[in-house]
Regions:
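Extracytosolic ligand-binding ectodomains
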Residues: 2-13, 25-417
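Sec/Tat signal peptide C-region and signal peptidase I cleavage site
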Residues: 17-25
Length: 417
């Protein structure tokens, strides 16, 4: 009987060791949920985002000392977790807030991810991050800009990108500079899709411009899934605004470009709020129809041999395109999350949360042109910043404002085609 008892203890000990070994082996891979539109109207942005995150994983999991001070590039894997590798579990939100919410739930409860990343469209980031908040799982958004996302009192949500108010201030200052140079900006039209992204950004721009003496003469709201924007373009043609600001995703931005050409409408100055106008598929499809459009950005590819140049080469092998601002912000958000996991030295949610709160990255540790990454109590990066770019050379955006970051001067009036 005593022998059987000892044998039982030994068997139990062996089982514990085996389970511990299995857990240790499992810890060699850290799973992060990445929720993006891999199908639907915004699929191009999601597919490019997937390529950006896969590039980031390559950089993290393999040693890339040539990338300078970029965190996690020097060594293979997460040093804080004994060289553990990162694995992204991609989930297609299909451009739907409800689908995105279900995917977030699945990733947390079934895939057992330690954190979430995504989800491009602000309206989907809104629903997916609500699930992570409920379950106490860290969520990092690298690209969603709706101001409301960091106004919910959430404790598990962190955003790396500048927000709508940051970009609205950039637009305001840029237009004032253009006015000082003789450009008329008295009447401004906002054209925006009607989800959380378009509506919230339009509201922020309207409020800021009004407070600074600029008039929004025309506000045009439309469905991002629309197949006909003739009436909206005819409104613009009739009202003749001095400035048109487009807040659009990819398919609707392409539709507007084609319709403007068909109806022979060109505003004197046209600006875009990133999103669809930064998508490489738009540039390939209708880039020749929107020459001279201004856009906002926080990213530019550096000279040969620089970290951003080398990263772009890696990304281009996966995607076939150069790294655009949106995909770069997605990549930056993923880097920030992985850096926090590494510093946490743990996959425990509260440890990752604490590491995110303590984040203090410097400009030379980033691929974006931010002043750094440091989160306030709401989870917003207070060091995020941006600039104005213009499509001047076929398919290439170039920085044009502010002057200290410009590679060339702005060209006016808007050329179109």
């Amino acid at each position: 009987m005593k022998f059987k008892y000892i044998l039982g203890l030994l068997s139990a000990a062996a089982m514990s060791v085996a389970l511990a070994g299995a857990a240790s082996a499992q810890d060699k891979t850290v799973k992060i949920g990445a929720i993006y539109p891999l199908s639907g109207n915004a699929a191009s942005a999601g597919v490019h985002g997937k390529a950006a995150i896969e590039t980031a994983i390559d950089i993290i999991n393999n040693a890339h000392p040539e990338l300078g001070n970029l965190p996690l590039a020097k060594n293979a894997g997460l040093a804080g977790l004994g060289g553990a590798k990162i694995e992204a579990i991609f989930a297609d939100n299909q451009g739907s807030p409800a689908v995105g919410q279900n995917q977030a739930l699945r990733l947390i409860t079934e895939e057992k991810v330690v954190a979430l990343n995504g989800a491009y469209q602000s309206g989907i980031t809104l629903t997916t991050s609500a699930i992570s908040e409920k379950y106490g799982i860290p969520y990092v958004a690298g690209e969603s800009v709706a101001a409301s996302l960091t106004e919910r009192g959430f404790k598990w949500f962190f955003r790396v990108t500048p927000i709508a108010s940051d970009f609205a201030k950039i637009y305001l200052d840029f237009l004032k500079d253009m006015k000082a140079g003789g450009q008329k900006i008295d009447n401004i039209a906002l054209v925006h899709e009607n989800t959380e992204y378009g509506t919230s950004v339009a509201n922020v721009i309207t409020g800021m411009f009004k407070d600074n003496g600029l008039s929004i003469a025309l506000d045009i709201s439309y469905s991002a899934n629309t197949t006909d924007v003739q009436s909206q373009v005819l409104q613009l043609k009739d009202k003749k605004p001095d400035v048109v600001i487009m807040i659009s995703y990819t398919s609707d931005a392409i539709l507007y470009a084609k319709t403007m050409q068909a109806l022979d409408y060109k505003p004197p100055l046209m600006m875009a709020d990133n999103a669809g106008f930064s998508d490489p598929s738009l540039i390939k499809t209708v880039g020749k129809l929107v020459q001279g459009v201004f856009n906002r950005s926080s990213f530019s590819i550096g000279p040969p041999g620089s970290p951003t140049f080398l990263i772009n080469e890696m990304y281009k092998k996966r995607s076939g395109d150069d790294l655009d601002d949106t995909a770069a912000r997605m990549m930056q958000g993923f880097f920030v999350l992985c850096d926090a996991i590494d510093r946490a030295g743990s996959t425990a949610p509260d440890k990752i949360q604490a590491a995110l709160k303590a984040t203090d990255l410097k400009p030379d540790q980033l691929i974006m042109g931010y002043k750094g990454v440091k989160f306030d109590d709401k989870g917003q990066n207070i060091l995020a910043s941006g600039l104005v770019i213009q499509l001047q050379d076929g398919e290439n955006y170039v920085p044009v404002w502010p002057k200290d970051k410009a590679k060339t001067a702005p060209v006016l009036p808007y050329k179109g085609w």
